[in-house]
Design a protein with these regions (language model features):
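Active-site microenvironment for binding and transforming phosphate-containing groups
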Residues: 1-265
Length: 265
């Protein structure tokens, strides 16, 4: 495998030593839904291919393989803190600690925390003053479950201040592509989201379309993150499925886009 191509995720105000990115598919091999770079073990890909992708990423970033902290892709709103206690665990205990986790928060330098997404919104956060970074997988379940609220609260418990937090949303499915059933609209209604902001109906089909980016922007604002500290990628994973993986377009058994963040010091 050659070098991995990244979509760099920029914060409004760059933070020295902090870097965030999303992977792209690389050189797509015909109809292979896992081609070329896939870091997710739980989507039916050959484990050796996933391992090769992870090794390539670690080498390219100049980290050891065990410095990549990646939970299995889960549609949850739970958050794990990666600290020295976690790092001291054996591999099985580390895996158990990340089971069912949808977001990671850390103050540690020298590690990459990241998540895999198929179409959901990957969100990286940083408080440069407190030295705290985070990453979240905000699919529709995680979004409706208030994953961003949980992440910001966890960051603040570690010493972050909401006014100092910056957030960047990476490549994800756009509203036009994200057609959903009414049961998903109901889930957002029950969670008290403003449906006038996040839902529109297709005039021809009557089907609902949800704007996950807008929903998570509202969640960031509600959590106290200033609007001026939020950036949003306009890349759509479904429209650009030749560049980013899309479970909606390619099927559940396909690769995932990896979004990571790390700090060097």
């Amino acid at each position: 495998m050659c070098m991995i191509d990244f979509e760099i995720m920029d914060f409004v105000q760059p933070v020295a030593g902090v870097h965030a990115f999303s992977t792209t598919r690389g050189q797509v091999d015909g109809g292979n839904p896992y081609s070329e770079v896939n870091l997710c073990y739980t989507v039916g890909d050959d484990a050796l291919h996933v391992l090769d992708s992870r090794i390539t990423l670690a080498r390219q970033l100049r980290f050891d393989l065990d410095d990549l902290i990646i939970p299995g892709q889960k549609h949850s709103s739970s958050v794990a803190v990666i600290d020295e206690d976690y790092r001291s665990l054996d591999i099985e205990s580390q895996d158990a600690a990340l089971d069912g986790v949808g977001a990671l928060v850390t103050q540690l330098s020298g590690i990459v925390i990241g998540i895999n997404t198929g179409d959901g919104v990957p969100i990286v956060l940083v408080d440069g003053q407190a030295g705290i970074i985070a990453v979240a997988h905000a699919g529709w379940r995680g979004t409706a479950g208030r994953i961003i609220k949980n992440v910001v609260e966890k960051m603040c418990r570690l010493g972050a201040r909401t006014n100092d937090i910056q957030a960047a949303m990476g490549p994800s499915i756009c509203q036009d592509c994200f057609e959903v059933g009414d049961e998903i609209v109901d889930a957002f209604a029950q969670a008290h989201f403003d449906l006038n902001v996040i839902v529109k109906r297709n005039a021809s089909t009557g089907q609902a379309h949800i704007d996950l980016r807008a929903a998570n922007r509202d969640e960031l604002l509600a959590a106290g993150v200033p609007a001026s500290n939020i950036t949003t990628s306009q890349h759509c994973s479904s429209c650009e499925h030749d560049r980013f993986f899309s479970a909606r377009h390619l099927g559940i058994n396909s690769g995932r886009t990896f979004t990571g963040i790390y700090k060097l010091y």
